[in-house]
Structure formats: C-alpha cells, structure tokens
C-alpha cells in the first residue's frame, strides 16, 4: 500500500507531523505567516489547496499592507487577489502601483476597510477626486495620508478631505500643483488643530497667505516642508515663529524670498532648518575655494 500524499504533493512519512498539522489559529497565523514576506506568500499559495486556504486566511486578517513588499512593480491581478478578503486594514501603501492604480481598483478596498488610519498613494496619477472622496467618507479614523505627486488633487478634493477627516495628523501634498492658497487656508481652518506634519513642497502656487493661516491654526505643527514654494517669503516664516511653539523642523530650500532674519528666531529655539545661516555658507564657500576653513574671529 502506497504511503498517503501530503498537501504539497510529496509522500507523507508514517507518524510525521506536517506543517499544516500545526494549529492554524494559534501557531501558523500569528507565529509563522506573519513573518513571511508578501512576495513569498504569492508563491506559497501555489503549493496546494490547503496552503492557498491558509494564505487567504492570513491575508484576510492583515492589519498592514505595503505593496513594496511584493516588489517594485505589482500586477493588478496580484493586488486584487492579495486584498480581496482584507477587511481589517489599518495601514495601506500602494506607491508601487502608481502606473495603473485606478478608482475602480482602490474604491472597493477602501469600502471594505473603514478602520484605515494610514494611506500612502504617492505618485498614483490615475486616481481621481472620486477615490479621495471615498477615502474621506469611508475612513473617519484616517490620521496619515500621502498624496505626493498626485496632480489630480485640486482645491475641491482637498476641501472634501478637510471636511470629513477629523483625525488627520499627517498630510503629504508634495507637488500637488493644482493647489493654491485658498485650499490650504481651508485645510488649516478645518483641520489645523490636529495637524502635526505637513508637506507643501514643490507647490509654486502656495505663498505667505497659506503659511500664515497654517501658523495661526496649527498650534501642534511639528514638521513643515515648504521646499521649492517660490511664493513663500519672510512674512510667512515670521508668523510661524510666532504661532507654532511645537515646530521642530522646517524645510525652506529654494524659497528664495525667505531671508535669514526671519529664520533666526526659529534657529534660537532649536528648530531644524535645512538652509544654513549665511556665515556658515560663507565659510563653506571659502573652504571650497582655498582648501581649508580659516579661523574666523567674530569678536569685535
């Protein structure tokens, strides 16, 4: 009589304990599959029907999904299979899907996962205002959102987000080039009290009006990125220094209208600023020119 086959297709040794004989709920799911990268799960589910069922049960219980764990490029079918049963996600990162991710791909996932607290959609240029509306409407606990390089994000989309996301703390709007001062002012007035981390980098239409309103409405703001915001000047920075006592870091590189006197008050408070003071810049330049930094006596 031939020995029985195990689920993987091999022969089962008499008295042998197979992996799938271990308790799924108490052992395999919390202590084994939780440590297997998503890419390997795609291979594992092909071994047998039993392994496929185990992997599907694990995926249905995911709390965090980062598409980067699958690879730099993930096919649409693979994403749909990985997320089809997930109903308890708290973190979702889909940047590797940026070339093809559409509203039709994303909206059903959002609808099944109302507990989402962190969503990263950087570079997902095929989405539209509909997806952001579904996120704002269906995920009231949302705290962190990245929309960097999403050109479709406009003032109306941001207003909907500000109206429906009371828990929002971190927002990345880098290179959302349709946004203007009016949209940022509305965001500050509606959600400024809870904002701690905000990036408006590379938004040429954002200026002092937006920065001053953020300063007056965001007392807990800790990190602000204004890199490349060409319309931001010293007036906005002075208002930040006056109204944002919790500020820890400020990015103003390529903000050519921001002068050192407006930054000095923040430097004295220990705020990390990515632009060096003029004296340091001069010493670095001199070092580059002559090969060493001479001793400079600053005493008069």
Curated annotation (Swiss-Prot):
Positions of the F-box domain: 19-66
LRR repeat intervals: 141-162, 167-188, 194-215, 220-241, 246-267
Major subcellular site: cytoplasm
Biological process annotations from GO: bone mineralization; dorsal/ventral pattern formation; G2/M transition of mitotic cell cycle; positive regulation of BMP signaling pathway; protein ubiquitination; SCF-dependent proteasomal ubiquitin-dependent protein catabolic process
Any one annotated GO CC term: cytoplasm
Repeat listed as a keyword: yes
Positions of post-translational N-acetylmethionine modification: 1
Region (Interaction with SMURF1) location: 113-269
Compartments in which it is found: Cytoplasm
Keywords, ordered alphabetically: Acetylation, Cytoplasm, Leucine-rich repeat, Repeat, Ubl conjugation pathway
InterPro entries in alphabetical order: F-box-like_dom_sf (IPR036047), F-box_dom (IPR001810), F-box_LRR-repeat (IPR050648), Leu-rich_rpt (IPR001611), Leu-rich_rpt_Cys-con_subtyp (IPR006553), LRR_dom_sf (IPR032675), LRR_FXL15/At3g58940/PEG3-like (IPR055411)
Pfam families (UniProt xref): F-box (PF00646), LRR_6 (PF13516), LRR_At5g56370 (PF24758)
Pathway: Protein modification; protein ubiquitination
Transmembrane segments: none
SMART domains: LRR_CC (SM00367)
Quaternary data: Part of the SCF (SKP1-CUL1-F-box) E3 ubiquitin-protein ligase complex SCF(FBXL15) composed of CUL1, SKP1, RBX1 and FBXL15.
Function as written in the Swiss-Prot or TrEMBL entry: Substrate recognition component of a SCF (SKP1-CUL1-F-box protein) E3 ubiquitin-protein ligase complex which mediates the ubiquitination and subsequent proteasomal degradation of SMURF1, thereby acting as a positive regulator of the BMP signaling pathway. Required for dorsal/ventral pattern formation and bone mass maintenance. Also mediates ubiquitination of SMURF2 and WWP2.
PANTHER family listed in its UniProt record: F-BOX AND LEUCINE RICH REPEAT PROTEIN 15, MITOCHONDRIAL ATP SYNTHASE COUPLING FACTOR B
Family to which the UniProt record says this protein belongs: Belongs to the FBXL15 family.
Annotated protein name in UniProt: F-box/LRR-repeat protein 15
